[in-house]
């Protein structure tokens, strides 16, 4: 019986969540990790080399972040977050791979508490809107191309090595 190493592409592995995820996954010998990020020379929104990669699972943690910055550079947010997701979905389609899309900040101002998955989504800034558009793209690819898609929306993630830029003073 042959064992098959799962090839897991982690896009955005240098970010807060990605750096922790890759550390945990390295402990599993049945997984081959394919780390992609701007820091290792990949422009996930436009580099055609991405389509040469073979993988079984894609974890999309890539993207530009920051609400204030999104108002100053909205084009970058829409381009990077949406096109990165589109390219990763195309890669998933090419490889018959599943994709885990990590999203955030899509609920806007809470209409009720606690906020649950049925809460309406609202893009009150370019960052949130780019995340909502990316989620919709994932749903479309899941429906039309039968790609297994999981969308996760972590909230208030914190821990070791977190950037102080994302912390709030109490």
Language model regions located:
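SDR active-site strand-loop-helix element
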Residues: 11, 36, 58-62, 99-104, ...
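Adenosine-cofactor binding site in Rossmann-like domains, unifying the SAM/SAH pocket
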Residues: 33-49
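NAD(P)-dependent short-chain dehydrogenase/reductase
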Residues: 113-114, 136-170
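N-terminal Rossmann NAD(P)H-binding glycine-rich loop of SDR-like oxidoreductase domains
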Residues: 8-26
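Active-site helix of classical SDR
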Residues: 126-133
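Conserved catalytic-core motifs of eukaryotic protein kinase domains, centered on the activation segment
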Residues: 68-76, 109-114, 163-164
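Conserved Rossmann-fold NAD(P)-dependent oxidoreductase catalytic core, especially the SDR/UDP-sugar
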Residues: 86-126, 150
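NAD(P)H-binding glycine-rich loop region in Rossmannoid oxidoreductase-like domains
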Residues: 48-80, 91
């Amino acid at each position: 019986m042959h064992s098959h190493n799962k090839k897991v592409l982690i896009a955005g592995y240098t970010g807060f969540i990605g750096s922790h995820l890759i550390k945990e996954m390295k402990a599993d010998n049945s997984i081959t990790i394919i780390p992609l990020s701007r820091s290792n020379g990949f422009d996930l929104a436009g580099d055609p080399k991405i389509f040469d990669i073979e993988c079984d699972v894609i974890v999309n943690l890539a993207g530009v972040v920051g609400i204030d910055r999104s108002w100053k550079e909205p084009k970058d947010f829409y381009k990077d977050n949406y096109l990165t997701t589109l390219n990763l979905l195309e890669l998933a389609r090419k490889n018959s791979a599943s994709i885990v899309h990590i999203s955030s900040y899509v609920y806007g101002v809470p209409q009720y508490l606690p906020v649950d998955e049925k809460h309406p989504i609202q893009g009150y800034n370019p960052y949130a809107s780019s995340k909502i558009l990316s989620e919709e793209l994932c749903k479309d690819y899941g429906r039309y191309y039968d790609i297994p898609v999981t969308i996760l929306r972590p909230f208030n993630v914190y821990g070791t090595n977190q950037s102080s830029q994302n912390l709030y003073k109490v």
